[in-house]
Amino acid sequence: MAEGLVLKGTMRAHTDMVTAIATPIDNADIIVSASRDKSIILWKLTKDDKAYGVAQRRLTGHSHFVEDVVLSSDGQFALSGSWDGELRLWDLAAGVSTRRFVGHTKDVLSVAFSLDNRQIVSASRDRTIKLWNTLGECKYTISEGGEGHRDWVSCVRFSPNTLQPTIVSASWDKTVKVWNLSNCKLRSTLAGHTGYVSTVAVSPDGSLCASGGKDGVVLLWDLAEGKKLYSLEANSVIHALCFSPNRYWLCAATEHGIKIWDLESKSIVEDLKVDLKAEAEKADNSGPAATKRKVIYCTSLNWSADGSTLFSGYTDGVIRVWGIGRY
């Protein structure tokens, strides 16, 4: 019996591209999503046939596209980054923004929480990486001069490795950089991509890092050594990457579908494509009419903490939910 993924349902409330999805680490029945409709939505997962989740709260305040959103480990707060140049911290229970982080001079493209939630990192089109405390004070800026990136910083993530606290960043300068969190000094520059790098993901144990972007190739790196291990061909622009929390799988959101690799065999386990016709027949069209685009593709994705469910956000504003099944 092979394991595969089947479409479990859809979640409709965003009116533009879904840019990011955050899932709680305790596997609670909520997720949070960010969109180019300038809002963040807190969803309650109902797991119904028609709608897998319902919008519980819409968080508004950003004045431009919201590009990224992450959850605190206790699930109480969401952190977002926007093209308005700001980060915001949101109290999910109250549905309000409790803090604004001002300092970037251009669009914020990526945000992340450290493991203990006491530190925040952000990446921007101003070519900097900023480290903040939760009070909204910028503690350190890694700038373009010296060791910093030479172009937009598109993605930034903390490694879950507590022994070697690390920040990983990806950039339009075609590199991935690995930084020591303790002093914000460069540990290694990972070069190998031939086009801009739009996304980076760190494996659950903190040993591996995967990067992808314009060249359609996923590169896997040994984080401790700063060495390239191998590459996987997606043959299409890559918008997002994530590791499964409990299988040796890597998922890529590409312009030609969601590709899932088994990293042991380096083979594709699944290539998920959307059947819009079948979806239209199943839906009762009660949700808001998303912008009509002929070609849609996945722009964001994240696993549930138990690895049973893959949430994927698309250019048409719909979140499609895939579940592990056997066939």
UniProtKB/Swiss-Prot annotation:
- Carries keyword DNA damage? no
**Residue ranges of WD repeats:** 13-44, 61-91, 103-133, 148-180, 192-222, 233-262, 293-323
Chief location category:
cytoplasm
- State the coiled-coil residue ranges: none
Q: Which GO terms describe its cellular component?
A: chloroplast; cytoplasm; cytosol; cytosolic ribosome; nucleus; ribonucleoprotein complex
Q: Name one GO biological process term.
A: positive regulation of signal transduction
Query: Which UniProt keywords are given for this protein, alphabetically ordered?
Result: Cytoplasm, Nucleus, Repeat, Ribonucleoprotein, Ribosomal protein, Transducer, WD repeat
Location of this chain's protein in the cell: Cytoplasm; Nucleus
Top-level division of the source organism's lineage: Eukaryota
Q: Which CDD domains match?
A: WD40
The record, for InterPro entries, names:
G-protein_beta_WD-40_rep, RACK1-like, WD40/YVTN_repeat-like_dom_sf, WD40_repeat_CS, WD40_repeat_dom_sf, WD40_rpt
> In which tissues is this gene expressed?
Widely expressed.
Question: Where do transmembrane segments lie in this chain?
Answer: none
User: What if the gene is knocked out?
Assistant: Shorter hypocotyls in etiolated seedlings, epinastic cotyledons, reduced rosette leaf production by half and late flowering under short-day conditions. Reduced sensitivity to gibberellin and brassinosteroid in seed germination, hypersensitivity to abscisic acid in seed germination and early seedling development, and hyposensitivity to auxin in adventitious and lateral root formation. Plants show a significant resistance to water stress conditions by limiting water loss through the guard cells.
Query: What SUPFAM superfamilies would the database entry show?
Result: WD40 repeat-like
Does the keyword Nucleus feature in the UniProt annotation?
Answer: yes
GO MF entry, a single one: structural constituent of ribosome
| Function summary | Major component of the RACK1 regulatory proteins that play a role in multiple signal transduction pathways. Involved in multiple hormone responses and developmental processes. MAPK cascade scaffolding protein involved in the protease IV and ArgC signaling pathway but not the flg22 pathway.
Q: How does it assemble?
A: Homodimer and heterodimer with RACK1B or RACK1C. Interacts with NUDT7. Interacts with GB1, MEKK1, MKK4, MKK5, MPK3 and MPK6, but not with GPA1 or MPK4. Interacts with OFUT20.
Can you tell me which family this protein belongs to?
A: Belongs to the WD repeat G protein beta family. Ribosomal protein RACK1 subfamily.
Tell me the protein's name.
Answer: Small ribosomal subunit protein RACK1z
**Native organism:** Arabidopsis thaliana
Q: Show the taxonomic lineage.
A: Eukaryota, Viridiplantae, Streptophyta, Embryophyta, Tracheophyta
